[in-house]
From Swiss-Prot:
It catalyses: L-methionyl-[protein] + [thioredoxin]-disulfide + H2O = L-methionyl-(S)-S-oxide-[protein] + [thioredoxin]-dithiol; [thioredoxin]-disulfide + L-methionine + H2O = L-methionine (S)-S-oxide + [thioredoxin]-dithiol. InterPro entries: Met_Sox_Rdtase_MsrA_dom, Met_Sox_Rdtase_MsrA_sf, MsrA_MetSO_reductase. It comes from Clostridium perfringens (strain ATCC 13124 / DSM 756 / JCM 1290 / NCIMB 6125 / NCTC 8237 / Type A). GO terms for molecular function: L-methionine-(S)-S-oxide reductase activity; peptide-methionine (S)-S-oxide reductase activity. It is an enzyme of class 1 (oxidoreductase). GO terms for biological process: cellular response to oxidative stress; protein modification process. GO terms for cellular component: cytoplasm. It holds the Pfam family PMSR. This is Peptide methionine sulfoxide reductase MsrA. Keywords: Oxidoreductase. Its EC number is 1.8.4.11. Has an important function as a repair enzyme for proteins that have been inactivated by oxidation. Catalyzes the reversible oxidation-reduction of methionine sulfoxide in proteins to methionine. Belongs to the MsrA Met sulfoxide reductase family. The active site is at 10.
Length: 157
């Protein structure tokens, strides 16, 4: 079982999209790489905590490779947009790939470099080791499964 943490704007849609991928074993939304401890959703939105809304993904590398997973992730974000995805604006909506296994870094950078060839603008998706992670409140978990008509900036159909 492998783990990767992906930020692509509002985590509700990112989690729903990723949870539908064959080989993804589990997903959880949370807050990553910020400046405080135990942030709440309100903290993320109103204070300068610098956390990103993220989806923690556990996947079976025998079914889907990191390269394949990232290829799918790139399709749901605008990697050239800084601190904004869809109608959501703020540093918490930045795009990022946060790794826990240093051996994943080369594959992540290769994926980003390959994608850059398709864009004239610079890709601003950050690639960093996971520094800290806090699970989001329960009402955010599987939000679009519980609220099928809830807000989502990603086309899921």
């Amino acid at each position: 079982m492998k783990k990767i943490i992906l930020a692509g704007g509002c985590f509700w849609g990112v989690e729903e999209f990723l949870s539908r991928i064959n080989g993804v074993v589990s997903t959880e939304v949370g807050y990553a790489n910020g400046r405080t401890e135990n942030p709440t959703y309100e903290d993320i939105c109103t204070k300068n905590t610098y956390f990103a809304e993220v989806c923690l993904v556990n996947y079976d590398e025998n079914i889907i490779s990191l390269k394949e997973l990232l290829a799918k992730f790139w399709t749901i974000i605008d990697p050239t947009s800084l601190n904004k995805q869809g109608n959501d604006v703020g540093s918490q909506y930045r795009t990022g790939i946060y790794y826990v296994d240093p051996s994943d870094l080369e594959e992540i950078l290769n994926s980003k470099e390959e994608l850059q060839k398709s864009y004239s603008k610079k890709i601003v998706t950050e690639v960093k080791p996971l520094e800290n992670y806090y699970k989001a409140e329960e009402y955010h978990q599987k939000y679009l499964k519980k609220n099928p008509n809830g807000y989502c900036h990603i086309k899921l159909d």
